[in-house]
């Protein structure tokens, strides 16, 4: 057996002094933690400030190295350490993806690290959402023991897609899962790509982004249908029998889960457009907290009904035609009398408030 030697490259300065004070996962830590790199390794930090997120590997020096079976915090059953994230393991190497807030010489200020104060640092690497992120990754026993973890995983994916967590992107995730479970539809990306299931949304707000992430149904794969009805509602349909489940949420009813300060900031920052940068940042924090709450509100807050939908044709393949004015190719169905719709001066677009008519210069036609 090979003897592996590691060199400590730095140390973590953390507000967490013992296991009981640290969060179960660094991702849920809101504290700023400092990573001090030793002088002889300072050159290794060149260009690190260009990275937004880092992978930090550290040595869990207070762990039990004899453990091979553990009972994790979110399950009552025993599991092998290699199937868990337990700090107690033969080679206790900790792993965290952190946000780099600032570099000050040899000190990196980060957020998202749950390591204890004084923990040795083994290595640091840049994190890439393109290379490192696996959107459909699961821990089977964990999701079995914690049904809520599926919603958590989907909402974190929705955050990457939507840009932030807010109440209605979370409601889109929650409503999608409710509809799919009621319909007996498994989470399967190929089902949406093959148009075996369709998602019919009745709004074009944040909720729709949550639906796209949770169902895999998008405009681009022709499995998302938008009805310009202005309702917070979603229908998931099986193409094989056109049976579906429609889920509706009353926005007025869920407002009781919003804090008074969050609502006041929303009106100031979003409705009146009067907020400062600090107001916007504070609203974002409130919105994320409220978004997580939306995953836990009673299912009775949602109106759920089984429906049947009239058959909808699969997306056909159309030939292209060349516009006689601009010379560009356009779908044949969008060329009238030799002109593309833009050159003809009349077409429709989806904007923030729904479907509107534009002229050739993208001016709204009233």
From Swiss-Prot:
Residue ranges of domain TsaA-like in the record: 6-136
Pfam families assigned: FmdE (PF02663), TrmO_N (PF01980)
Keyword S-adenosyl-L-methionine: yes
Gene3D superfamilies: 3.30.1330.130, YaeB-like (2.40.30.70)
Keywords: S-adenosyl-L-methionine
Binding site for S-adenosyl-L-methionine: 23-25, 61-62, 85, 116-119
UniProt cross-references to PANTHER family, sorted A to Z: DEHYDROGENASE (PTHR39418:SF1), DEHYDROGENASE-RELATED (PTHR39418)
Family statement: Belongs to the tRNA methyltransferase O family.
Protein name: Probable S-adenosyl-L-methionine-binding protein AF_0433
